[in-house]
Amino acid sequence: MTDNIYPNALHADSTEPIQEDTNQEASLEYPQEATLDTGKPILLIVEDNEEIQKYISESFADSFEVLTAYNGEEGKQQALNRIPDIVVSDIMMPVMDGITLCRQLKEDVQTSHIPVILLTAKDSLQDKEEGYEVGADSYLTKPFSASLLRSRINNLLESRKKLIAQFQTQSVPDNQADLKEKRIVIAEALSKLDNEFIEKITLLIEENLSSEKIDITYLSDKMCMSGSTLYRKMKALTGLSTNEY
């Protein structure tokens, strides 16, 4: 990660110093969640302040394929087009704010699995409650350091990796009690939409195992999404491609 100078624009709203924990951050490594294009995980930054957007983009360019948008509407379209591994969004933006963006991403089965970190200029309990109510996974109050954001992103992606590990081992449990327990853990960790998605595609595959018509095109049509979107969602939730699943 690049050590960029924190933009002056972020200091205007706070007089509190930035707390850096260099020892902790130095030991963190990003999970390698491959993408279809670059082999890097995809980070979508939705931020209308050009300085802040540039600061985050340059800080993570070495470890992520970085996408940017200047408002929630642009961010939503980027998310639908590319299905990023994680979204970092400001709250106060023109056209569509970050709360609305988060809500719409979490309510769309194509993007409901994507972790969202919201950035806010004020440490307001009301703002945080509203964000968590629409499915935000984490919050950061400006000003923040790139290393702190890195830690949040890393933790969210590591949590997803652990869930994937649970998912991949549930088919070979020691006994039925273990299988039931693992399924409960997975179900509790996923949203309602993502649980319904897994149940639907599992049923589709099981019902058509002997059919010649079952392929990526058939499954993507039945799941009402493109083949590439289905691939990325399956990889994000299970660690397996559609064919492997």
Regions of interest found by a model, annotated:
Residues T68-I86:
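Acidic, metal-coordinating helix/loop segments flanking the phosphotransfer/catalytic sites
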Residues K54-E58:
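Charged docking surfaces used in two-component/phosphorelay signaling
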Residues F144-I153, L157, A165:
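C-terminal output helix
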Residues E47:
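Conserved acidic carboxylate
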Residues M93:
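Receiver (REC) domain active-site loop signature in two-component systems and cognate sites
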